[in-house]
């Protein structure tokens, strides 16, 4: 069936919308566990839909001026509503405005924060700053860190196991690549330093 990928994408979109309704219902009921599970499921479906678009060349960056500190503060509020982990924000070096696709960057950071929420022992740190002409978003946790095989994954490798972390990383690298300034493109880097460290760098 030649139209199956498009049909699957439409189905994912529909189910994601239904899950968003479930999220709203859980919020009204104050059911934090149901809220967390529904939001994770909705985020996974969003990644699948965006992965389909990336694989078919339909994913585009809609770049405009945004305040990086604002999106981080909004995601921090969501994080704190779902987790007892300590969340530290380092926004003092964040530029007032920067040009990027806010929706795509939000999706990437939300996914990374969900992973940090699952693996951190006690704390997660999020920072935004400018480094060598790039806008850098960094998320670090105090968990076990990234496994060695993930640190060596090729830049645009498609996750063979369909894992949430692998799919999120695949999308993050596509999102980074969509942001360009001349010959310079965005990059994603992973590292371990007392836990996992994720960096998304976008050229300014």
Question: Language-model features: where?
Answer:
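Short helix-loop "hinge" at the ATP-lid/N-box region of the Bergerat-fold HATPase_c
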Residues: 115-117
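Short beta-strand/loop element within the Bergerat-fold HATPase_c
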Residues: 123-133
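Glycine-rich phosphate-binding loop
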Residues: 162-174
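Conserved DHp (HisKA) dimerization/phosphotransfer helix of two-component histidine kinases, i.e.
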Residues: 33-82
């Amino acid at each position: 069936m030649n139209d199956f990928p498009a049909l699957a994408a439409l189905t994912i979109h529909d189910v994601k919308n239904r899950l968003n309704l479930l999220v709203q219902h859980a919020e009204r009921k104050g059911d934090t566990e149901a809220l967390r599970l529904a939001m994770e499921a909705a985020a996974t479906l969003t990644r699948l839909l965006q992965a389909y678009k990336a694989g078919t060349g339909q994913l585009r960056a809609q770049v405009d001026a945004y305040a990086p500190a604002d999106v981080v503060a909004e995601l921090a509020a969501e994080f704190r509503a779902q987790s007892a982990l300590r969340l530290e924000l380092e926004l003092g070096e964040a530029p007032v405005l920067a040009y990027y696709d806010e929706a795509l960057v939000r999706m990437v950071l939300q996914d990374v924060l969900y992973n940090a929420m699952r693996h951190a022992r006690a704390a997660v740190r999020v920072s935004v700053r400018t480094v060598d002409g790039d806008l850098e978003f960094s998320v670090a946790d105090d968990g076990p860190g990234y496994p060695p095989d993930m640190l060596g994954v090729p830049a645009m490798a498609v996750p063979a196991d369909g894992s949430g972390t692998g799919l999120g990383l695949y999308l993050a690298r596509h999102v980074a690549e969509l942001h360009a300034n001349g010959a310079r493109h965005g990059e994603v880097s992973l590292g371990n330093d007392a836990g996992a460290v994720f960096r998304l760098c976008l050229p300014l």
